[in-house]
């Protein structure tokens, strides 16, 4: 699969036609989706829209997949929940609106866990999404369908969003690039009242340049999202042409609390020190507060509040593992919800010291390799018992702080499974994270390696 930036140039130059490209994508979906289960709804008008595409626009008819919790006018948007089984929005999300204005053709909607609540892509409506690198293993989540579609080579770009790791975890498990932009960088409207203050819109791509291209087209303030940030009046895509120089990078294998698969740790350590070409890399010992319980408390209470008096109805159709969350909600109080803000400040106080001394922080993206479908996660890592979400300890801290953070492929395990490295920037330094990512991509390319399907 070529870079989206190159495909766009071919579309503009007439070397390929948008309708031909869309037809090729649909053929791949027909052939590969029965194996990986990435798509849950297709846009029946995609070919018709591609024939009308304006090749003078920035995307010139490029096909893009949209995660099924991002609303698409006239295309079913289910949130992968029985509650929304037949919901067809009357307006586009801001993200989709901007993509269409830029000339994108929406090819369809991608699979995810119900309401995007967990980092494992499965639900009662559509079933699990399978990892193209090993069909017996998970893609993670919650942007799992999008990651599978791009990893399988169906198309170069798919949308995702990230409230606790939901772009970065699938990127790690599927061997892709996935940036969680700064909170507010891309307007988020409309959205469910879940992961409030944590949620960022973004993309899954094979190339850093393609993520930069897409963000150039969708970033910037919108009156419908009061927390959206003003646009930065420069191009990310042009900015990453220049490698960083003289940067100071801290590498932490565990943030001070994580239990990590030794193979994951070693691969990420090797990858991190490849960045010494662009500055100084130092392994550091951290002792950050772990906000795992705060994440669980926040999500559970927000979901219970959102479902409200339809709880009995939802319990009959919900993804079975969610029923445990509902039981947990009975023991939680909104006092605990409010105290999350205190813990966020504790976390940032600890991180502030790191980012006063270093420009970037590198960690593993996930503490383990992709695990088998049918499990919500491993029960232990390196022979040590972990909590139910102890396998994903590196991503959610930076949802609480709102910092930009990306997963980029660090290498592959002995079994041939992707392993991701997380690059975290200072608040609002999205362009810096993209620059470091592009620099790493240039010294450690991975894009020519594809799964066999």
Curated annotation (Swiss-Prot):
Reaction(s) catalysed by this chain's protein: a monocarboxylic acid amide + H2O = a monocarboxylate + NH4(+)
Coiled coil location: none
Catalytic residues (UniProt): 67, 142, 166
InterPro entries (UniProt xref): Amidase, Amidase_CS, Amidase_dom, AS_sf
Listed PROSITE patterns: AMIDASES
Top-rank taxon: Archaea
Record keywords, A-Z: Hydrolase
The EC number(s) this enzyme carries: 3.5.1.4
Gene Ontology MF term list: amidase activity
Keyword Hydrolase (UniProt): yes
Similarity comment: Belongs to the amidase family.
Protein name: Putative amidase AF_1954
């Amino acid at each position: 699969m070529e870079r989206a930036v190159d495909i766009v140039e071919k579309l503009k130059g007439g070397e390929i036609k948008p309708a031909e490209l869309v037809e090729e994508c649909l053929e791949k979906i027909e052939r590969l989706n029965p194996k990986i289960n990435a798509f849950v709804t297709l846009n029946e008008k995609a070919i018709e829209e591609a024939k009308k595409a304006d090749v003078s626009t920035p995307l010139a008819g490029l096909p893009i997949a949209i995660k099924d919790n991002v609303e698409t006018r006239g295309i079913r948007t289910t949130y992968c929940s029985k509650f929304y089984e037949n919901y067809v929005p009357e307006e586009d999300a801001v993200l989709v609106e901007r993509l269409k204005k830029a000339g994108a053709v929406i090819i369809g909607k991608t699979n995810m866990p119900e309401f995007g609540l967990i980092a494992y892509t499965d639900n009662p409506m559509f079933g699990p999404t399978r990892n193209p690198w090993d069909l017996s293993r998970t893609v993670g989540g919650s942007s799992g369908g999008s990651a599978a579609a791009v990893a399988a080579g169906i198309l170069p770009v798919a949308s995702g969003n990230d409230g606790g790791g939901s772009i970065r975890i699938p990127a790690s498990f599927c061997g892709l690039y996935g940036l969680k932009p700064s909170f507010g960088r891309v307007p988020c409207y409309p959205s469910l009242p879940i992961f409030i203050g944590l949620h960022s819109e973004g993309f899954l791509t094979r190339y850093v340049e393609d993520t930069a291209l897409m963000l150039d087209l969708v970033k910037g303030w919108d009156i419908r999202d009061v927390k959206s940030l003003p646009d930065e009046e420069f191009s990310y895509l042009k900015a990453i042409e220049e490698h960083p120089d003289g940067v100071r990078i801290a590498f932490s294998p565990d943030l001070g609390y994580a239990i990590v698969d030794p193979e994951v740790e070693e691969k990420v350590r090797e990858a991190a020190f490849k960045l010494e070409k662009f500055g100084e890399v130092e392994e550091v010992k951290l002792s950050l507060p772990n906000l795992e319980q705060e994440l669980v408390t926040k999500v559970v209470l927000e979901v219970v509040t959102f479902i409200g008096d339809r709880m009995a109805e939802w319990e009959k159709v919900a993804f079975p593992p969610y029923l445990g969350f509902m039981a947990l909600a009975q023991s939680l109080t909104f006092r605990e919800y409010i105290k999350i803000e205190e813990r966020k400040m504790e976390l940032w106080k600890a991180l502030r010291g790191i980012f006063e001394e270093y420009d970037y922080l590198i960690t593993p993206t996930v503490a383990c390799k992709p695990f088998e479908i049918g499990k919500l996660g491993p029960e232990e890592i390196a022979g040590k018992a972990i909590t139910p979400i102890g396998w994903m300890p590196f991503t959610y801290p930076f949802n609480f702080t709102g910092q930009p953070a990306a997963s980029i492929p660090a290498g592959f395990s002995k079994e041939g499974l992707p392993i991701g490295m997380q690059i975290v920037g200072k608040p609002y330094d999205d362009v810096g994270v993209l620059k470091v990512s592009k620099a790493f991509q240039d010294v450690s390319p991975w894009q020519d390696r594809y799964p066999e399907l």
